[in-house]
Amino acid sequence: MSMDVTFLGTGAAYPSPTRGASAVVLRCEGECWLFDCGEGTQTQLMKSQLKAGRITKIFITHLHGDHFFGLPGLLCTISLQSGSMVSKQPIEIYGPVGLRDFIWRTMELSHTELVFHYVVHELVPTADQCPAEELKEFAHVNRADSPPKEEQGRTILLDSEENSYLLFDDEQFVVKAFRLFHRIPSFGFSVVEKKRPGKLNAQKLKDLGVPPGPAYGKLKNGISVVLENGVTISPQDVLKKPIVGRKICILGDCSGVVGDGGVKLCFEADLLIHEATLDDAQMDKAKEHGHSTPQMAATFAKLCRAKRLVLTHFSQRYKPVALAREGETDGIAELKKQAESVLDLQEVTLAEDFMVISIPIKK
């Protein structure tokens, strides 16, 4: 199963001609999951090879405008492009408490009627995710007058034992959220692909006398088969080792993680996407505003033993490599060096708009 990540917006605070506001798409076999939806995300989608109509899930890390102000417009555009296709499955939206009310208000005030259904699942933050004076209590409201296309979502509480939030667990993936520290409650997301059955051992099948055909499919799917001679063949008799799934972790704005949930969920991630708003020389300023530097991001990646670190959410002062001036000592290339110095020169990737990173199947 193919899997890749496309960066639609890699800039902080606001969209610019060189970097869009925060938005990342994880694509699995054509289905797209959107992580954050800053202003202008739908325009970035149109410039990419992705299709907005393929989006089935949306994850919002926190309620700062550069991470979710593009959401109402995107939903409207998907609706317009859907025509009368009312059979479309509901779009699942995950984010902090208050997100459902925001979507409801914008749809109500703009008299918008979507042609598809959507459902908002809200994560309830804890008080230690932001400075005390910035914490606002948003009640999860179950309205009788909800928009006609909105289905009832869940209120998701922290699992205190796991130190994480279980968003969903299906046949292919387990997706969880973990707490981050920022000026307002922020979250990171861990997407883990489940193990898949190993390949059939052709030689063993032959030796055991299993005839080619339907029996192969059953064994591949974990079902035992009985041969004509009465011998039962179990899947473990003929299957090679299971294929370990891939892990992608995407963090919202933060100056650190809260609890050990983030470290556990991001451990040995195949791809870790972490913000690095400012360079290391401005670490105090970054922390003051709830942000990270390359050194901070790399330190977390090293703690998690992440296999690949990608930095994003750069201050708009840091232009993409192709636009950087020759001889600059405080440009984007310096951020790469700062992160790599922590990771013993392990290569670090600097995200740019429309960059696509493939996550290959593990051998």
UniProtKB/Swiss-Prot annotation:
Keyword Metal-binding: yes
CDD domains per record: RNaseZ_ZiPD-like_MBL-fold
Location(s) in or outside the cell: Cytoplasm, Cytosol; Nucleus
Keywords for the protein's UniProt record, in alphabetical order: Cytoplasm, Endonuclease, Hydrolase, Metal-binding, Nuclease, Nucleus, tRNA processing, Zinc
EC number: 3.1.26.11
Binding site for Zn(2+) 2: 66-67, 253, 313
A GO BP entry: rescue of stalled ribosome
Family: Belongs to the RNase Z family.
Functional description taken from the UniProt entry: Zinc phosphodiesterase, which displays some tRNA 3'-processing endonuclease activity. Specifically involved in tRNA repair: acts downstream of the ribosome-associated quality control (RQC) pathway by removing a 2',3'-cyclic phosphate from tRNAs following cleavage by ANKZF1. tRNAs are then processed by TRNT1.
Assembly mode: Homodimer.
Name by which UniProt lists this protein: Zinc phosphodiesterase ELAC protein 1
Organism from which the protein derives: Homo sapiens (Human)
